[in-house]
Amino acid sequence: MKDKCKVIAIANQKGGVGKTTTTVNLGVALARMGKKVLVLDSDPQGSCTRCCKIEDPDTLEVTLSELMAYEMTGEDKDYILINNAIKQFENIHIIPSNISLSGTETALFNCMSRESVLKRTIEPLRNSYDVILIDCMPSLGMMTINALVAADSVIIPCEPSYLSVKGLDLLLHSIARVKRQINPNLQIDGVLMTMVDSRTNNAKDITRALRDAMGISINVFNIEIPRSVRATECPNVGESIFVHDPNGKVAEAYANLAKEVISLERKAQVRPRPHGLR
């Protein structure tokens, strides 16, 4: 019997903290461990779509926007439509996005049960995948709320800088509100420090302060994603870090992150997590 699919939102309202890089490379790493992975690009900028070497996304006939539009109008989404939306990148599948998703987000405000449109959209896909990763847009708008409602858990990429860490409070408040009002099973898998230059005291001090502030209530992954020129090249060449720099430290870090994500899921199946966010 197939294990339950886990939906993970990769979220932070601050841009440039490694959300898309984490989504793609964590997805590839999980697939390398035998998981069947689907990535959803829920950002109208289509950063994840472009990173996955999908050229001219604005010319695509079926994207996440069209699938959500069908859900909003109550029309049936047949498997032909869904299959036309799904693209292949290395060892993972992706449902791409383009600028039309901006219009979809606006339309959500006039939709019944607007916070759960994405959840209903991806429900038919859960039986086909082990993991669904949602690359969230850099805002706390309606699309990000939809991602949090659709998700089982959240991973929060965070750069070791004062402004990035300071902005976590607003995101954590939004997650707590979604958990309290709509999605009581939503959990935080952890805060992931990205683009870490371990040579600098500043990065070490900020990471240490974050761990102290979170205490035992919110996990801060021991794994950190190092700053790397090779990693920044990946979107330009349309490759994951496992293809572009397979023996580098970033590939090793994402491989270890994938192991920890699977370990968290196994622990959750053994014992219940504490109720609520503290």
PLM feature spans:
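P-loop NTP-binding core
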Residues: M1-R278
